[in-house]
């Protein structure tokens, strides 16, 4: 774990008192359009200071929550499987410590580590997926772990009808046909 010099939106509670732990996953291993997702955790931290922290709907300040920013996981350069395993292990530790994990960063493929760890504790979990693409390919350019098949890997963990997709505008025809029987898209 590499501690960041900048925390996300005043998330400065100590680990022991926090009920939520945010961590970054800087990784760019399977990005196919434009690289740069590895910079997302730091940029999201920087830009978070421009956000409003008060919710008029809940009449609460986000800063009232006990949130610890753990920093960034050390990237497994060029090895998406190792990075996913690292995320899985860290998320599993957070859950065993009764912490709510929030991962920021990197590319879509990394979500598999968090999904697997959370599903082991909460097998009835569902995924709300907001994206332009289905990400439901089994294999993408001969790779089973990529940004283009992360939701297919999630389906392998969760099973049918546990994934709800919103905003989907494109994907391969076979992904849409497969989704009709296995996920919920709108």
Q: Could you tell me what each predicted segment is?
A:
Residues 1-186:
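Conserved alpha-helical scaffold segments that buttress catalytic/binding sites
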């Amino acid at each position: 774990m590499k501690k960041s010099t900048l925390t996300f939106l005043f998330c400065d509670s100590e680990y022991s008192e926090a009920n939520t732990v945010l961590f970054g996953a800087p990784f760019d291993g399977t990005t196919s359009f434009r690289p740069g997702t590895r910079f997302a955790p730091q940029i999201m931290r920087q830009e978070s200071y421009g956000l409003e922290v008060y919710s008029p709907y809940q009449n609460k300040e986000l800063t009232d929550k006990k949130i610890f920013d753990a920093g960034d996981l050390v990237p497994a350069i060029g090895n998406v499987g190792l990075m996913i395993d690292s995320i899985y292990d860290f998320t599993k530790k957070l859950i065993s410590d009764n912490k709510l994990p929030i991962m920021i960063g990197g590319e879509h493929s990394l979500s598999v580590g968090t999904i697997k760890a959370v599903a082991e504790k909460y097998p009835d979990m569902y995924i709300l997926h907001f994206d332009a693409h289905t990400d439901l390919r089994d294999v993408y350019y001969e790779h089973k772990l990529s940004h283009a098949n992360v939701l297919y890997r999630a389906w392998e963990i969760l099973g049918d009808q546990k994934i709800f997709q919103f905003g989907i505008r494109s994907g391969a025809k076979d992904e849409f046909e497969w989704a009709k029987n296995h996920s919920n898209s709108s």
